[in-house]
């Protein structure tokens, strides 16, 4: 993209941040953070369970409030920001889509594993027909070749998506790979289709990868204020805004205000520091889905097996988002082998 075009920054702290909070963000915290982001000029804010609409379950975790309660509380408070919702086919349904639309959600992001775009057809088609900003979200994009990512993106566009994301769910990708995949998407898809990038900070490359994506043609970039998100967190938005200001890339976001939100609102919400520790670093190194981190830590406490060893084995097995139930089974099996 041209560097004088505005980049749309999309906050994840109230959705991906749910993973770090075990889905226990209160309504008051949600409103406080969202209204401050709105005032700072953040144009898009994602609000749902960490695993998207309908994610409340024994497998993924029960939230403090329902998606409907969160969306009903936040959307009427917004003055300029729009609210998005994530949906994973097999977790979220068309009924959830209709509910989100009725409550005022403007953007639906339909997420699949990077080789399974075909399961998104029903949801993307329905969201598009509802008149929503409809995004295809290819997760764990490091696990597929450039050609496969392009192939899957074309499927999502054919279903009705007006934007497709290359999603580094594991925080595994290096800037060269980001540039290669984003460039291929931009060169192949129609100019009317936006390209997006979603990064995690497990190798401390969230900002660098996001800049590489922008320089390669991405117009939408995800991040979280103070990095609040799964693993070592998402790309920290306040840092990205500062870097973009230095590079004279427009975002429309007030840097000082977003810095203050990070320090005064988001950091006090954290149950533990969002940082690159040995376990989150292992996520990035082994290419493991970032939301597996707390599941692995809980398994470590329960079975006495190193979370790091569990994560490495999950990486070897090529596990993907949605297979959280395998983590405890694996830890139990590993603990028996150690006895």
Curated annotation (Swiss-Prot):
The organism's taxonomic lineage, starting at the top: Bacteria, Pseudomonadati, Pseudomonadota, Gammaproteobacteria, Oceanospirillales
PANTHER family the UniProt entry points to: 2-ISOPROPYLMALATE SYNTHASE 1, CHLOROPLASTIC-RELATED (PTHR10277:SF9), HOMOCITRATE SYNTHASE-RELATED (PTHR10277)
Organism: Marinomonas sp. (strain MWYL1)
Gene Ontology MF term list: 2-isopropylmalate synthase activity; 4-hydroxy-2-oxovalerate aldolase activity; manganese ion binding
Enzyme class: lyase
Stated name of the protein: 4-hydroxy-2-oxovalerate aldolase
EC number: 4.1.3.39
Gene3D superfamilies xrefs: 1.10.8.60, Aldolase class I
Keyword tags: Aromatic hydrocarbons catabolism, Lyase, Manganese, Metal-binding
Binding residues annotated for substrate, in chain numbering: 15-16, 169, 198, 289
Active site residues according to the UniProt entry: 19 (proton acceptor)
Binding sites annotated in the UniProt record for Mn(2+): 16, 198, 200
Positions marked as site (Transition state stabilizer): 15
Domain Pyruvate carboxyltransferase positions: 7-259
Signal sequence interval, chain numbering: none
Catalytic activity entry: (S)-4-hydroxy-2-oxopentanoate = acetaldehyde + pyruvate
Family statement drawn from the similarity comment of this UniProt entry: Belongs to the 4-hydroxy-2-oxovalerate aldolase family.
Single GO biological process annotation from the record: L-leucine biosynthetic process
């Amino acid at each position: 993209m041209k560097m004088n075009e505005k980049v749309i920054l999309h906050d994840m702290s109230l959705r991906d941040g749910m993973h770090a909070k075990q889905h226990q963000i209160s309504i008051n915290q949600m409103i406080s953070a969202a209204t401050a982001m709105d005032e700072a000029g953040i144009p898009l804010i994602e609000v749902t369970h960490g695993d998207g609409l309908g994610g409340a379950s024994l497998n993924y975790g029960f939230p403090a409030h329902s998606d409907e309660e969160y969306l009903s509380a936040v959307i009427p408070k917004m003055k300029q920001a729009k609210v998005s919702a994530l949906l994973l086919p097999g977790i979220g349904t068309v009924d959830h889509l209709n509910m989100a639309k009725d409550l005022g959600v403007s953007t639906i992001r339909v997420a699949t594993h990077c080789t399974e775009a075909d399961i998104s057809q029903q949801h993307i088609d329905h969201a598009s027909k509802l008149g929503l900003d409809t995004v295809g979200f290819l997760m764990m994009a490091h696990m597929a070749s450039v050609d496969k990512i392009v192939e899957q993106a074309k499927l999502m566009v054919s279903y009705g998506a007006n934007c497709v994301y290359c999603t580094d769910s594991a925080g595994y990708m290096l800037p060269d790979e980001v540039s290669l995949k984003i460039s291929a998407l931009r060169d192949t898809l129609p100019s009317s289709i936006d390209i997006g990038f979603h990064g995690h900070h497990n190798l401390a490359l969230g900002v660098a990868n996001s800049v590489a994506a922008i320089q390669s043609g991405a117009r939408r970039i995800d991040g979280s204020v103070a990095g609040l998100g799964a693993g070592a967190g998402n790309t920290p938005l306040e840092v990205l805004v500062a870097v973009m200001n230095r590079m004279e890339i427009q975002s429309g976001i007030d840097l000082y205000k977003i810095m203050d939100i990070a320090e005064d609102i988001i950091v006090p919400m954290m149950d533990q520091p969002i940082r690159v520790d040995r376990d989150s670093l292992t996520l990035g190194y082994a290419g493991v889905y970032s939301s597996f981190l707390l599941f692995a830590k809980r398994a470590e406490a329960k079975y006495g097996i190193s979370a790091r060893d569990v994560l490495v084995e999950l990486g070897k097995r090529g596990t993907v988002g949605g297979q959280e139930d395998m983590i405890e089974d694996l830890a139990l099996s590993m603990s028996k082998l150690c006895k």
